[in-house]
Amino acid sequence: MDTPERESIEFDVVIVGAGPSGLAAACQIKKQAAEQGKEVNVCVLEKGAEVGAHIFSGAVIETKALDELFPTWKEDGFALGQPVAKDEVYLLRDESRATELPHWAVPPSMHNDNNYIVSVANLCRWLAEQAEELGVEIFPGFTAADVIFDDNGKVCGVATGDMGVGADGEPGPGYTPGMDILAKYTILGEGCRGHIGKGIIKKFALDSDADPQHYGIGFKEIWQVPESQHKPGLVVHGSGWPLSKGMGGGFFLYHAENQQVFVGLIIDLNYANPHISPFDEFQRLKHHPIIAETLSGGERITYGARAITKGGLNALPKLSFPGGMLVGCDAGTLNFSKIKGVHTAMKSGMIAADAILEALGTDAEEKGTTNFQQLFEQSWAYQELYNSRNFGPA
């Protein structure tokens, strides 16, 4: 049967992924362009049915990047989340015993003064609202299937996936072809498992001077707990049991707003015992008194898991390629010494935006180049990753 032809649409910038890095990039481009009297068309592609649909994360975040992007977010009434009130760090010795580390023994990078316990999905929804008010076009429900190259090998956009394809790979009754989203610059902010970013890193050998990337898996649940067991603003981290010798990782327990608690376990994916089940280790963890005293009598309301890019600066690839750049977890900007990555992801997107604005309308635009790498290496985000570069390897 005859199949419809693919259509195309052109923008100045296309951003793949409506996560913290991609949305921060979109907002920064439009804000700075307006200040400079420029008109820049920006499109954000999001595979989820809505922004935040594929983001399951309760996190403790620093507001440094948010403060730079929207200095008046507090005055504007954005309820970011629960301010951190207290830090606790434990070493779990076995299934029933634990030792709390004194505050002076906890690395400064894990102190959470002035930080917030937030829903990253809610943060992204708010950023998306700001982006749309600034004129960004956000297309939810569109998956970027591959990049598009021009005749010179420069990335010139992305192709969205076809819909209505049968199991045999042939068009079915409801077949709808994808679209070619063409752009002068393409920002990849897909997250840790971004397949387009992985392909770009390989094609342009962006990781040729970097260490192999390190990965972990994080299990997370959100619980509604009794009011008597809820301590708003309490942040608990720990390591040890149930992880055995040779297994890296740790747990977290965050007391958020509305009697909700975020609990999870992160396990490095280099464990030697092939019979280990990370999911079952997480279930064991919840029976430890340190965790159980909070969850007892509560109700689990949602759960999930995600991969984590945790190699840090030593495993960070080059961030620029002809026609585009990598931001956030697509590159690996998580600061593992802080167990935080939202602020550095947002900053990487904001720097990418600044680099693109500098390049548009110049000879660099024709070549698809920017000074993103240089700008990133001059930023506080890079300095933060540099300062913690030996935390994981040590």
Label each residue range with its predicted role.
Residues 305-336:
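FAD-binding beta-loop-beta segment adjacent to the flavin cofactor pocket
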Residues 21, 50, 193:
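Conserved Rossmann-like nucleotide-cofactor binding loop
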Residues 1-16, 20, 135-139:
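Glycine/serine-rich loop-strand microenvironments at binding/catalytic pocket rims
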Residues 39, 47-96:
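N-terminal FAD cofactor-binding segment of flavoenzymes
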